[in-house]
């Protein structure tokens, strides 16, 4: 199959090069969104076949099977989070030529006369928050985001402020390239909340000041369980455990027995690319992790309240790093359960507070056919010595 993928703007009077007009003139089968069809309909041959690109896409590609050559219209640059990428994934052996125009974020930057060579681009179009969360935590100074009807500018602004990211201003571009409907608004995040914008739209976030990004958060800074500092992993131990987990190289992290969420929060701040799932049996943990993630600006940590041994984990992404901060007297059984999900090359780190739990961990690791890679003993002030032990 051969595909010609033509990028276009949202302008009703959209113009095309002579090469593209010649291509359209001899084309037989065309495809694109309903808006694209409205704009180009008068330029197509009378006997043209048109295939609407709508979800589910399986039906679209089923129709494509009947034709050897298809001309596809897409918005902006079809290779920028666009339909050309979908074609490449679905039909990797198909021949393709792309005719791009400026994508929407480029166009918005042009309207602002804003250099965008170092802009971090994220797509929220049918996608989770992960990439935007990562950009905010990293402190990227310029972020361009593609929106959809669910993740609107208002909802994005509200979520940013919920987690303390008031250090950006937002510019929203609406119907960019459409001479009759285009709008550009630069606003504070507070001004964006509750405001409705025409669709399609996109936005650029410009950092107004550098937000503090902590490393080694003091225990006293967290909201604590009944005010008890002894119930939180101490900063030196927390950082050593995270170091032994080697999270630079990992993708999915499970934090078992999160209590205040300190380990998950520290991990998210230093390794914002991680998918983190945190587990806690105490109901109070829900309030604590909600308070602390918002205090320290760590959106995206998924938490699960209940006995880890009774939770159904089958729908969660399998971990390649696991921290055990609490085991409720079921350490041996917990290791067996973790072993069923831990990806090849993954590791576990356990903070042992007693000789008995250290012995149980060693024996439990041996029983599941794994081995101890490293262990370090640390004593903080007048607290009991902790052994941080890693298994692979």
Task: Show which residues each predicted segment covers.
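A short glycine-rich, Lys/Arg-flanked "PGG" loop and its adjoining helix->strand segment in the class I
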Residues: 335-347
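Conserved beta-strand signature within the Rossmann-like core of class I S-adenosyl-L-methionine
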Residues: 345-353, 357
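Class I S-adenosyl-L-methionine
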Residues: 1-97, 106, 273-276, 280-282, ...
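Class I SAM-dependent methyltransferase SAM-binding "motif I" and its flanking Rossmann-like core
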Residues: 9-12, 79-139, 309, 359-380, ...
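Conserved class I S-adenosyl-L-methionine
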Residues: 250-259
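Conserved SAM-binding loop of SAM-dependent methyltransferases across substrates and taxa
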Residues: 260-272
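Conserved SAM-binding loop
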Residues: 289-292
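A contiguous loop/helix-start segment that scaffolds small-molecule binding in enzyme catalytic cores
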Residues: 1-6, 18-19, 69-70, 140-230
């Amino acid at each position: 199959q051969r595909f010609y993928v033509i990028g276009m703007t949202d302008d009703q009077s959209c113009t095309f090069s002579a090469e593209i007009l010649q291509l359209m003139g001899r084309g037989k089968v065309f495809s694109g969104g309903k808006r694209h069809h409205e704009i180009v309909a008068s330029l197509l041959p009378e006997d043209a076949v048109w295939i609407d690109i709508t979800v589910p896409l399986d039906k679209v590609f089923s129709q494509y099977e009947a034709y050897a050559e298809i001309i596809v219209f897409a918005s902006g640059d079809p290779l920028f989070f666009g339909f050309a990428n979908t074609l490449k994934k679905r039909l990797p052996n198909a021949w393709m030529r792309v005719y791009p125009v400026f994508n929407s974020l480029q166009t918005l930057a042009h309207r602002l006369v804003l250099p965008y060579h170092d802009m971090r681009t994220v797509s929220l179009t049918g996608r989770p928050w992960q990439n935007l969360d990562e950009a905010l935590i990293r402190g990227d100074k310029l972020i361009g985001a593609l929106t959809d009807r669910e993740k609107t500018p208002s909802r994005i602004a509200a979520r940013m402020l919920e987690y303390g990211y008031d250090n950006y201003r937002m510019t929203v571009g609406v119907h960019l390239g459409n001479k009759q409907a285009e709008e550009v608004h630069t606003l504070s995040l507070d001004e964006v909340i509750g405001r409705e914008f025409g669709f399609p739209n996109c936005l650029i976030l410009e950092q107004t000041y550098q937000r503090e990004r902590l490393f080694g958060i003091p225990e006293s800074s967290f909201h604590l369980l009944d005010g008890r500092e002894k119930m939180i992993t101490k900063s030196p131990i927390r950082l050593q455990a995270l170091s032994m987990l080697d999270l630079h190289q990992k993708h999915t992290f499970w934090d078992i027995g999160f209590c205040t969420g300190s380990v998950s929060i520290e991990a998210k701040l230093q390794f914002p690319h991680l998918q983190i799932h945190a587990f806690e049996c105490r109901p109070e943990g829900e309030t604590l992790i909600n308070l602390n993630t918002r205090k320290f600006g760590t959106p995206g940590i998924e938490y699960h309240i209940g006995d880890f041994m009774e939770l159904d984990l089958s729908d969660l992404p399998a971990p390649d790093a696991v921290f055990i901060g609490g085991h409720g007297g079921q350490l041996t059984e917990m290791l067996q359960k973790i072993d069923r999900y831990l990806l090849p090359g993954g590791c576990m780190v356990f903070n042992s507070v007693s000789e008995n739990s250290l012995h149980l961990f060693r024996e439990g690791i041996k029983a599941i056919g794994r081995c101890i890679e490293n262990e370090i003993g640390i004593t903080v002030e007048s607290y009991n010595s902790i052994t941080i032990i890693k298994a692979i």
